[in-house]
Amino acid sequence: MANRQQPSPMPTAKYRGYDQVDIADRTWPNQRITTAPRWLSTDLRDGNQALIDPMSPVRKRAMFDLLVKMGYKEIEVGFPASGQTDFDFVRSIIEEPGAIPDDVTISVLTQAREDLIERTVESLKGARRATVHLYNATAPVFRRVVFRGSRDDIKQIAVDGTRLVMEYAEKLLGPETEFGYQYSPEIFTDTELDFALEVCEAVMDTYQPGPGREIILNLPATVERSTPSTHADRFEWMGRNLSRREHVCLSVHPHNDRGTAVAAAELALMAGADRIEGCLFGQGERTGNVDLVTLGMNLFSQGVDPQIDFSDIDEIRRTWEYCNQMEVHPRHPYVGDLVYTSFSGSHQDAIKKGFDAMEADAAARGVTVDDIEWAVPYLPIDPKDVGRSYEAVIRVNSQSGKGGIAYVLKNDHSLDLPRRMQIEFSKLIQAKTDAEGGEITPTAIWDVFQDEYLPNPDNPWGRIQVANGQTTTDRDGVDTLTVDATVDGAETTLVGSGNGPISAFFHALQGVGIDVRLLDYQEHTMSEGASAQAASYIECAIGDKVLWGIGIDANTTRASLKAVVSAVNRATR
């Protein structure tokens, strides 16, 4: 059938296509990725510089600690010569004992100016492992428009910068620092391949890589300009033509201007790249850097260990959202609120049958479901492997962006809300922000939470307030609860029996006309030690309403009763 599309009015003549690479015997299409690459996170540099409101020192530290916890061994921590804030952050993590694990290398970026190089190297004094990353733009438009220099002029910038890095490293860094060097011909994707090779060779001639003296050559798609296949061709060509290849770590740094950064990174690995630089969830300039989470989880979904821990993907997201003051899209691969949810009835039916088939297969083999190969329609991985459950995600299939609120409550107030309670509370915050506009501060979030869930002794509300209670257990294991209470303003004593204090309290509430059914109950300690308090969360059906309540007390039984009162009072508020 003929293509009926018509020419558009857009000025396509303004643009030219990308250059093809003359490499007829390319080998990368026949390769497979069977091991994880070296990873470098540049969230604290490339990611941070792209934020409207760059991270505060506290948020930077939270991001650094997250990256370390996840298992990243190379972390670009800033551009210390760009300002005092970045310099001070680098110094703070170096000077704090134990902040940087012994097997983690920090990296810092610099341009090829002597004053900047000196300041950059100075920031690394005392570091156990450190890399200086020097870059200069090499593409024709930069040579012509920005620097107004020849090829030789641009190459000399790279050579002189490399020499200065070596000199200042020898002058300022002691023997306790395991020093590394990285060079990037910025705008590699727009640079002629022969010139990119010429510059890299000149840099290596200066640095003299060899046994025990690696050089990292990073070939950035500073702006993504071609298909991933052409990007792979460029990497294979460079890998074939670089001298001293055995002493070179060939690194890829894709951006997502064409929306294919993940594919470009994966094909570059197939073409011989050793290392990938990127950011969690694709944060970065313009359309972002390549997404390290998607790359790692793509490996995981193919049975390849990414050597990064994504087992609590929502905790990673909460911290990321707090640090970046941004939200992860609900359709973001592997982590978005909707990615394990199917709205189509036929999809849901296929998923259910897939679960049933796996359970039957596991039973027939005499093993658990976790011991057999994952095979469920529409679910590329088992959501449980990243801390999710299919049922829980279904409950939030129209929600997004709740991680930041949960992060504030957990980190500021030690409250780890159950997932469904997060959803319930986030609706209250959303209503407040819709009504008032603008940002909502952590203090305001806590004020809303207290007013909604926790009793205010200065301004009590709700049908019920409880005071002292006592539980006894008979020989049959039945608990009887007696509790002093105020119901509708009148003091009374409530008495009920059941299988445990909560069941007994539900029975007692029936005596004052309140019918409560338990749907879910969770609890955790908020701290350690003799004065530790417990937080109890209870989901109740009260009439035709389903609501959560919370109770906080040093005694877990009292905390659970307070949680019931919280839910009941909310239902009648």
Swiss-Prot record:
Gene3D superfamilies linked to this entry: 3.30.160.270, Aldolase class I (3.20.20.70)
EC numbers: 2.3.3.13
Entries under InterPro entries matching the protein: 2-isopropylmalate_synth_dimer, AIPM/Hcit_synth_CS, Aldolase_TIM, IPM_Synthase, LeuA-like_post-cat, LeuA_allosteric_dom_sf, LeuA_N_DRE-TIM, PYR_CT
CC cofactor: Mg(2+)
Subunit structure: Homodimer.
Entry similarity comment: Belongs to the alpha-IPM synthase/homocitrate synthase family. LeuA type 2 subfamily.
PANTHER family for this protein: 2-ISOPROPYLMALATE SYNTHASE (PTHR46911:SF1), PTHR46911
Protein's recorded name: 2-isopropylmalate synthase
Keywords from the named record: Amino-acid biosynthesis, Branched-chain amino acid biosynthesis, Cytoplasm, Leucine biosynthesis, Magnesium, Metal-binding, Transferase
Residues involved in Mg(2+) binding: 46, 253, 255, 289
UniProt record, GO biological process: L-leucine biosynthetic process
Enzyme class: transferase
Biological role stated in the UniProt entry: Catalyzes the condensation of the acetyl group of acetyl-CoA with 3-methyl-2-oxobutanoate (2-ketoisovalerate) to form 3-carboxy-3-hydroxy-4-methylpentanoate (2-isopropylmalate).
A family per Pfam: LeuA_dimer
Domain (Pyruvate carboxyltransferase): residue spans on this chain: 37-314
Catalytic activity: 3-methyl-2-oxobutanoate + acetyl-CoA + H2O = (2S)-2-isopropylmalate + CoA + H(+)
One GO cellular component, as annotated: cytoplasm
Residue ranges, annotated region (Regulatory domain): 456-573
PROSITE patterns: AIPM_HOMOCIT_SYNTH_1, AIPM_HOMOCIT_SYNTH_2, PYR_CT
Keyword Transmembrane: no
Principal subcellular localization: cytoplasm
HAMAP family: LeuA_type2
Localization in the cell: Cytoplasm
